[in-house]
């Protein structure tokens, strides 16, 4: 796997992926670039739900969303 720099499309897709989880009260539990796979078309796949939680409370989801946005703002590279 190679590393790619986060662009606007990837950032939007990562945030959307986490928002979809949170809409269903699912907390991923391990927000980090190693758990995000970027496809050639810049779509993303979240992996490693070992720490995931169903029916997460709202505060957990808000905190996780903040982590995701912080990671994206930092411009970290993610694997493809």
Identify what each model region corresponds to.
Residues 17-21:
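Conserved hydrophobic alpha-helix
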């Amino acid at each position: 796997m190679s590393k790619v720099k986060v662009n606007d499309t990837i950032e939007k897709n990562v945030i959307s992926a986490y928002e979809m989880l949170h809409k269903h009260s699912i907390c991923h539990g391990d927000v980090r670039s190693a758990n995000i796979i970027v496809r050639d078309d810049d779509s993303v796949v979240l992996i490693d739900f070992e720490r995931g939680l169903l029916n997460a409370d709202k505060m957990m989801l808000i905190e996780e969303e903040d982590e995701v946005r912080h990671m994206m703002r930092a411009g970290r590279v993610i694997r493809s």
